[in-house]
């Protein structure tokens, strides 16, 4: 089989009226990423020479989103062409012709069909082999709305003669169950010739890309069909209902992959991954957990129910108790080996927990580093802080890190004990082994090993009587 350069053309011009949204259809998200991003990643996996995205409705928004792309397609060469006005699929591909060299194969994909697998497309390209028109097809129980594959005979191996759009099909043609998926591979030199012959003599007065099949037959070029059985691979998104249905398919398949790798999921139907999740051996994930962005879970990590974890690395043996929210955003969050977090804890960007750190219920940590064995077990805030080993941080204590204009750091050295309900006003340093008495407001550095108490002196008034309410008040 000869090797031909591959150019991928992606249809992304449609408005998506049934989505009932101002957002261009191809930018709606599945698995936390735009539909179009999934298609671009697939193109990158095929080692395409370039991807040409045909835009129309919301073109500037689509192009801007592509410019911010990450993942497998980050290094893919990308070009954009506009389809204005939108006069059909054939007209759309005509707009791409000026940037398609004749030495290659053109693979036509849809920007709203996110679950097509690279292996499926590789098989389709092998059928094309630089000299045939190859179509990706599927047999459906209810083919309404799809273009039908018309063959020269009734045998499944019979030569493909035409694709007839549903609105133009006769009753006999509508009885055909094999449909065209919208995906084809065609030698570019032939595509250019056939697109020049298109007309809009049909019910919709549009230029159909599918009409090139009859031109191929007329020219004696073989038209082959690669038929698959997995409908999800060619399922498009045209409504919020279809998007939700496809989201469930995506999540179920991802859950199956995780379990095949050894991850224990309490309920595969109650897992949402909206990015990239990697897991070590013997990871356990309870129900209703959401993973966003890039998340890695080390060996033996346990995630309790109802946790939301985004852009975080959680090391081996750590336990994240239920209802914990971890959001690394751009700075990321690091949780060390054997650490315990939650329940009802919040780790914000820049939180870096060392090994065996304990963060308990209703504790918030932001842009702070906690060394091995440090503990903040309940009702506390640590922001812009550096916390040493074995520090005990009392309930109700906070770092006052913001002066209204700038953030300042608090340094708490090793073996410090911070009593309950303390305020550490940054910038401030608490020396190693020091103790801060409960209820203190600390505004100056505390020497190592010292006891520091910064609060009003307690006064007790003997025989004091509470005020008595006046009648009728």
From Swiss-Prot:
Which positions bind acetyl-CoA?
395, 401-402, 420, 438, 455
The EC number(s) this enzyme carries:
2.7.7.23, 2.3.1.157
Q: Where is the active site?
A: 378 (proton acceptor)
This protein's GO cellular component annotations are:
cytoplasm; membrane
* Pathway as given in its UniProt record: Nucleotide-sugar biosynthesis; UDP-N-acetyl-alpha-D-glucosamine biosynthesis; N-acetyl-alpha-D-glucosamine 1-phosphate from alpha-D-glucosamine 6-phosphate (route II): step 2/2; Nucleotide-sugar biosynthesis; UDP-N-acetyl-alpha-D-glucosamine biosynthesis; UDP-N-acetyl-alpha-D-glucosamine from N-acetyl-alpha-D-glucosamine 1-phosphate: step 1/1; Bacterial outer membrane biogenesis; LPS lipid A biosynthesis
> Where does it reside?
Cytoplasm
Q: Which cofactor does it need?
A: Mg(2+)
Q: Which PANTHER family match?
A: BIFUNCTIONAL PROTEIN GLMU, NUCLEOTIDYL TRANSFERASE
Q: Which residues bind UDP-N-acetyl-alpha-D-glucosamine?
A: 25, 83, 88-89, 110-112, 147, 165, 238, 348, 366, 381, 392
Q: Name one GO molecular function term.
A: magnesium ion binding
N-acetyltransferase as annotated region, ranges? 262-473
The keyword Metal-binding is assigned to this record: yes
What does the record give as the reaction this protein catalyses?
A: alpha-D-glucosamine 1-phosphate + acetyl-CoA = N-acetyl-alpha-D-glucosamine 1-phosphate + CoA + H(+); N-acetyl-alpha-D-glucosamine 1-phosphate + UTP + H(+) = UDP-N-acetyl-alpha-D-glucosamine + diphosphate
Q: Which gene encodes it?
A: glmU
Region of interest (Pyrophosphorylase), ranges: 1-240
Protein task: Catalyzes the last two sequential reactions in the de novo biosynthetic pathway for UDP-N-acetylglucosamine (UDP-GlcNAc). The C-terminal domain catalyzes the transfer of acetyl group from acetyl coenzyme A to glucosamine-1-phosphate (GlcN-1-P) to produce N-acetylglucosamine-1-phosphate (GlcNAc-1-P), which is converted into UDP-GlcNAc by the transfer of uridine 5-monophosphate (from uridine 5-triphosphate), a reaction catalyzed by the N-terminal domain.
What does the subunit section of this Swiss-Prot or TrEMBL entry state? Answer: Homotrimer.
Return the protein name.
Bifunctional protein GlmU
What family does the entry list?
Answer: In the N-terminal section; belongs to the N-acetylglucosamine-1-phosphate uridyltransferase family.
Residues reported in the UniProt entry to bind Mg(2+):
112, 238
Give the span(s) annotated as Linker: 241-261
- The answer to whether the entry has keyword Oxidoreductase is no
The free-text note explaining how the cofactor binds reads: Binds 1 Mg(2+) ion per subunit.
Taxonomic lineage = Bacteria, Pseudomonadati, Pseudomonadota, Betaproteobacteria, Burkholderiales
An individual GO BP term: peptidoglycan biosynthetic process
Q: Which UniProt keywords apply?
A: Acyltransferase, Cell shape, Cell wall biogenesis/degradation, Cytoplasm, Magnesium, Metal-binding, Multifunctional enzyme, Nucleotidyltransferase, Peptidoglycan synthesis, Repeat, Transferase
């Amino acid at each position: 089989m000869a090797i031909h350069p591959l150019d991928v053309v992606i249809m992304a011009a449609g408005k998506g009226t049934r989505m009932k949204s101002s957002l261009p259809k191809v930018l709606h998200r599945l698995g936390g990423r735009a539909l179009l991003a999934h298609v671009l990643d697939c193109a990158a996996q095929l080692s395409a020479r370039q991807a040409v995205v045909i835009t129309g409705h919301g073109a500037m928004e689509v192009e801007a989103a592509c410019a911010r792309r990450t993942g497998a397609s980050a290094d893919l060469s990308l070009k954009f062409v506009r389809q204005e006005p939108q006069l059909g699929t054939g007209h759309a591909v005509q707009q791409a012709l000026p940037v398609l060299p004749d030495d290659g194969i053109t693979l036509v994909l849809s920007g709203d069909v996110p679950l097509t697998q690279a292996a499926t497309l590789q098989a389709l390209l092998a059928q094309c082999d630089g000299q045939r028109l190859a179509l990706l097809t599927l047999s459906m129980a209810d083919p309404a709305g799809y273009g039908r594959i018309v063959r020269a005979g009734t045998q499944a191996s019979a030569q493909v003669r035409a694709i007839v759009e549903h609105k133009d099909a006769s009753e006999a043609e509508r009885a055909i169950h094999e449909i065209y998926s919208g995906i084809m591979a065609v030698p570019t030199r032939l595509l250019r010739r056939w697109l020049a012959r298109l007309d809009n003599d049909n019910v919709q007065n549009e230029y159909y890309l599918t009409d090139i099949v009859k031109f191929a037959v007329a020219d004696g070029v073989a038209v082959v069909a690669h038929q698959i059985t997995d409908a999800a691979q060619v399922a498009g998104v045209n409504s919020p209902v279809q998007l939700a249905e496809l989201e469930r398919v995506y999540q179920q398949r991802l859950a199956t992959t995780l379990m095949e790798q050894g991850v224990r999921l309490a309920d595969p139907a109650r897992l949402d991954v909206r990015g990239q999740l990697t897991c070590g051996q013997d990871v356990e994930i309870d129900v209703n957990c959401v993973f966003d962005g890039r998340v890695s879970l080390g060996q033996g990590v346990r995630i309790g129910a109802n946790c939301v974890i985004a852009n975080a690395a959680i090391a081996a043996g750590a336990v994240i108790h239920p209802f914990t929210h971890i959001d690394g955003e751009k700075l990321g969050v690091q949780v060390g080996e054997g650490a315990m977090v939650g329940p009802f804890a919040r780790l914000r960007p820049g939180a870096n927990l060392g090994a065996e750190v304990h963060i308990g219920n209703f504790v918030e940590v932001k842009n702070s580093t906690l060394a091995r064995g440090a503990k903040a077990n309940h009702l506390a805030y640590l922001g812009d802080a550096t916390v040493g080993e074995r520090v005990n941080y009392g309930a109700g204590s906070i770092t006052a890190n913001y002066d209204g204009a700038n953030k300042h750091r608090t340094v708490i050295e090793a073996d410090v004990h911070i009593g309950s309900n303390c305020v550490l006003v940054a910038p401030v340093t608490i020396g190693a082994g020091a103790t801060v008495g409960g209820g203190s407001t600390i505004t100056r550095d505390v020497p190592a090993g010292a006891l520091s108490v910064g609060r009003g002196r307690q006064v007790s008034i003997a025989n004091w009587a509470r005020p008595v309410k006046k009648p009728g008040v």
